[in-house]
Swiss-Prot record:
Record flagged with keyword Transcription regulation: no
Signal sequence extent: none
Coiled coil: none
Name of the protein described by the UniProt record: Phosphoserine aminotransferase
Record family assignment: Belongs to the class-V pyridoxal-phosphate-dependent aminotransferase family. SerC subfamily.
Broad class of where this protein is predominantly found: cytoplasm
Gene it is expressed from: serC
Organism: Pseudomonas aeruginosa (strain ATCC 15692 / DSM 22644 / CIP 104116 / JCM 14847 / LMG 12228 / 1C / PRS 101 / PAO1)
Binding residue positions for pyridoxal 5'-phosphate: 77-78, 103, 153, 173, 196, 238-239
UniProt-listed InterPro entries: Aminotrans_V_dom, Pser_aminoTfrase, PyrdxlP-dep_Trfase, PyrdxlP-dep_Trfase_major, PyrdxlP-dep_Trfase_small
Keywords: Amino-acid biosynthesis, Aminotransferase, Cytoplasm, Pyridoxal phosphate, Pyridoxine biosynthesis, Serine biosynthesis, Transferase
Residues with the N6-(pyridoxal phosphate)lysine modification: 197
Length: 361
């Protein structure tokens, strides 16, 4: 097998080599059963055991309290933009949303289809280069919930703090930074995360929801989108995304073997520190985000001359540094450095950046 490249894609993102090798070994014959996990009935004892272990491993990693349900659903995080208000926003209620970029704006637009949304704060006032402090927020006293995106993958903004919302449930899109460091789940009413960044392959979304928030869905909420339906049926009301669930379980096992989220925090800190240090020490590369709001997972940067973007990307690909092109709405470059990428990937990237700057700077 040829050497694997370093994949800096924002999602679907890199998976740990050990996980892919395990999946490859079990692809045709799972543990001597003579069939692939892809071919298993989701009702079989073997698959139920796979699913249950994945849930327990995730509970262990995040120390999820017993009064929270863990759901493995389909539709991705974008479907949650509708599912959350359908389940949590009464017809006469108000939901508070914090706007920090493209993904939170999409959530806001979708929620407005189902009820009243108060944009309690927006990073637009800071050109989306900083996150408004909570003292700048205008929260609704009796809001149904407060929603924010903990990390904006496109703009590269990340909260380094958890908002205080009192008795109002706190809801967060944690698609791109879940499992990157320790987390106090008890601070939240609901956490959701599309799998294809830091959990596993695409086709799956994980929802962690406090039990007292179940059973509040509107009468028009489709059965399939009702969290209580999923919770009451072990996320198997219909056939789930079985293989994505299985692979995510392998990722959870791998994370535990690496030392869990505490070890991931140390590893991720080293990666982001090296990359931002390289950018800040250069007159050739720039990142405009306020340092306290810089994402650990998604690092956008620009070159001094955008005409050099194409040769930079071509040179990177030739060196096995893939998917560094920034999002089409932002331009420039973006390095997504999720859990699966090691420090060696960032070291290879910054070495290339120094080489390119020396040649073109």
């Amino acid at each position: 097998m040829s050497k694997r490249a370093f994949n800096f894609c924002a999602g679907p993102a890199a998976l740990p080599d050990a996980v892919l090798q395990r999946a490859q070994a079990e692809l045709l014959d799972w543990r001597g059963k003579g069939l692939s996990v892809m071919e298993m009935s989701h009702r079989s004892d073997d698959y139920v055991a796979i699913a249950s272990k994945a849930e327990q491993d995730l509970r262990d990693l995040l120390d999820i309290p017993s009064d929270y349900k863990v759901l493995f659903l389909q539709g991705g995080a974008s479907q949650q933009f509708a599912e959350i208000p359908l389940n949590l926003l009464p017809e006469d209620g108000v939901a508070d949303y914090i706007d920090t970029g493209i993904w939170s704006k999409k959530a806001i637009e979708e929620a407005r289809r189902y009820g009243t949304v108060n944009v309690a704060a927006s990073a637009k006032e800071y050109d989306y280069f900083a996150i408004p402090g909570q003292n700048e927020w205008t929260l609704t006293k009796d809001a149904a919930y407060v929603h924010y995106a903990s990390n904006e993958t496109i703009g590269g903004l990340e909260f380094d703090w958890i908002p205080e919302t009192g008795d109002v449930p706190l809801v967060t899109d944690m698609s791109s930074d879940i499992l990157s460091r320790p987390l106090d789940v008890s601070r939240f009413g609901l956490i959701y995360a599309g799998a294809q960044k830091n959990i596993g392959p695409s086709g799956l979304v994980v929802v962690i929801v406090r039990e007292d928030l179940l059973g509040r869905a509107r009468s028009v909420c489709p059965t399939m989108l009702n969290y209580k339906t999923a919770a009451d049926n072990g996320s198997m009301y219909n056939t789930p995304a079985t293989y994505s669930w299985y692979l995510s379980g392998l990722v959870f096992e791998w994370l535990k073997e690496q030392g869990g989220v505490t070890a991931m925090e140390q590893r991720n800190r080293a990666k982001k520190d090296l990359l931002y240090k390289t950018i800040d020490a250069s007159d050739f590369y720039t990142n405009p985000i306020q340092p306290s709001a810089r994402s650990w997972m998604n690092v956008p940067f620009r070159l001094a001359d955008e005409r050099l973007d194409k040769p930079f990307l071509e040179g990177a690909e030739a060196r096995g540094l893939l998917n560094l092109k920034g999002h089409r709405s932002v331009g420039g470059m973006r390095a997504s450095i999720y859990n699966a990428l090691g420090l060696d990937a960032v070291e290879a990237l910054v070495a290339y950046m120094a080489e390119f700057e020396k040649e073109h700077g």
